[in-house]
Amino acid sequence: MIDAFFIAGTDTDVGKTVASKAILDALNMKGLRTAAYKPVAAGSEDKGEGVQNSDAIHLRAVANVELRYEEVNPYALLMPASPHIAAEAENVVIDYSVLSEGLASLKEKSDVVLVEGAGGWRVPVSKDDCLSTWVQQEKLPVVLVVGIKLGCLSHAMLTAEAIQHDGLEIIGWVANRVNPGTENYAEIIKMLEDKMPAPKLGEIPYMPSVKRKNMGKYIHLEALDN
C-alpha cells in the first residue's frame, strides 16, 4: 500500500471531497490508519474556532487518525476564489516547505495519507506557481475525480495528459455523478474506461448530501495495493 496519494479533480465542484470520503471509508474498512490532508482551501469561514474549511472538516471527520484541524488544513483562506487570489487578498504566502513538513508529519502518524487538492489540476496558488508543482516535488501518485456531466470527457483527458506530462503516475480514477439528469451516462463511462490511463476505482451515484455516508462500498482499492 502506498503511504500517500493526491486527489485531483477535472474542475472545481466535481466532487473531490465526496470521492475522498468514499476512498477514506474504503481504506478504513481495510483496517488502515488513515489521515486526510487538505493543504490549501479557499472559501473558509470563522465560526468562533478559527478559520476552517468545510471540506477539510468533512475529511478530518472521516479519517480515523485524530488530528488537530491545523494539521489537516494548514492554509485556510476566507475568500471563495482561486487560492492565489484569496491568498493575495489576505497577505498569505503559501510556502511549499510548510506543506511538505505537514505531509511528512501525517505520514509518521498513519498508514496512508489522502491529500486532496483545490480546484482543478493547474490551480494557481500564487501569480507564479500552481499547487501541481508541489505535488510534483512530493512525487505523489494521483487519483483523478471526474464529475460526470456534459464536457467531462475533454476535461478528463486533458487533465490526465497534464498529470502525465508533469511526470506523475495516475493510479486510478473515480466517476462521480454530479447531475442525475446527465444523458448518455453509460456511454460516457465507457469512453472514460477506454481512454483513461489507469483503472476505474469506482462510480459514486448522485445522492443528496444527507445520504453521503458509508460510501466505501462504491470504491475498489485494488490499484492502490500495488
From Swiss-Prot:
UniProt binding sites for Mg(2+): 17, 55, 116
Keyword set, alphabetical order: ATP-binding, Biotin biosynthesis, Cytoplasm, Ligase, Magnesium, Metal-binding, Nucleotide-binding
Cofactors: Mg(2+)
Enzyme class: ligase
EC numbers, comma separated: 6.3.3.3
One Pfam short name: AAA_26
Location, primary (coarse class): cytoplasm
Pathway linked to the protein: Cofactor biosynthesis; biotin biosynthesis; biotin from 7,8-diaminononanoate: step 1/2
Localisation: Cytoplasm
Record: active site: 38
Cellular component terms (Gene Ontology): cytosol
SUPFAM superfamilies the UniProt entry points to: P-loop containing nucleoside triphosphate hydrolases
Its job: Catalyzes a mechanistically unusual reaction, the ATP-dependent insertion of CO2 between the N7 and N8 nitrogen atoms of 7,8-diaminopelargonic acid (DAPA, also called 7,8-diammoniononanoate) to form a ureido ring.
Similarity comment: Belongs to the dethiobiotin synthetase family.
Protein name listed in UniProt: ATP-dependent dethiobiotin synthetase BioD
Organism: Aliivibrio fischeri (strain ATCC 700601 / ES114) (Vibrio fischeri)
